[in-house]
Amino acid sequence: MRVLDSAPVTLGRGAQNDLSLDSDDFASARHAKIEPRRDGVWLEDVGSTNGTYVNGARIGKPRRLAPGDVIRVGSTDLRYER
């Protein structure tokens, strides 16, 4: 579990990410970013090769997350809870 504060959280295979998925061969080195904003928490794909998914649908632009959403980065599933 990771608690979000006001800072964005980066996800990917590279060690430079806040949440490193180093054992996931399908995650890009820099894959996605989760960013708390005034109007909610947003997920953005940052140019990954295999895409970022929410509830099974690939996102093409930033998407606001809702509690219970399942985020897929590479072959890793993460659940967003408020």
Where are these regions (language model features)?
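Forkhead-associated
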Residues: 3-82
